[in-house]
Design a protein with these regions (language model features):
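Long, contiguous binding/interaction regions
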Residues: 1-56, 64-93
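S-adenosyl-L-methionine
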Residues: 61
C-alpha cells in the first residue's frame, strides 16, 4: 500500500458538506483504504470561481491505498455535485 494525500474542495453549504463527507468516508472504506488523518482546513475564498462558487470548504485526507483504487476514486468523485475539485498526490515514504 502507498501513502497519498487527498485535498477535496466542497461547496460550503452545510447539508451538502455533511453528505459529501459521509460519501468520501464510505468510498475510502469500501475500497479498503485506511484513513490515517482527516483535517478540516475550513472555508476559504477560491482564487477563481469553480462551478459558480467563489468559496469552498477544504478537507485534507492522508490515506493508505493501492494505486488502482485512486482511479476508482477519480471516477466516483467526478459524479458528485457537492465536490468542486479534488487532488490526490502520492507521498514519498
Amino acid at each position: 500500500m502507498r501513502n497519498y494525500e487527498a485535498v477535496l474542495i466542497f461547496k460550503p453549504e452545510s447539508e451538502l458538506l455533511a453528505e459529501g463527507r459521509e460519501f468520501v468516508k464510505g468510498l475510502f472504506n469500501d475500497n479498503g483504504c485506511k484513513v490515517v488523518k482527516e483535517e478540516e482546513m475550513g472555508e476559504r475564498t477560491l482564487a477563481y470561481e469553480i462551478k459558480k462558487n467563489s468559496k469552498g470548504f477544504y478537507l485534507l485526507y492522508q490515506i493508505e491505498s493501492e494505486p488502482e483504487n485512486i482511479q476508482a476514486f477519480d471516477k466516483a468523485l467526478k459524479l458528485r455535485g457537492e465536490i468542486l475539485k479534488y487532488l490526490f498526490v502520492r507521498k514519498e515514504q
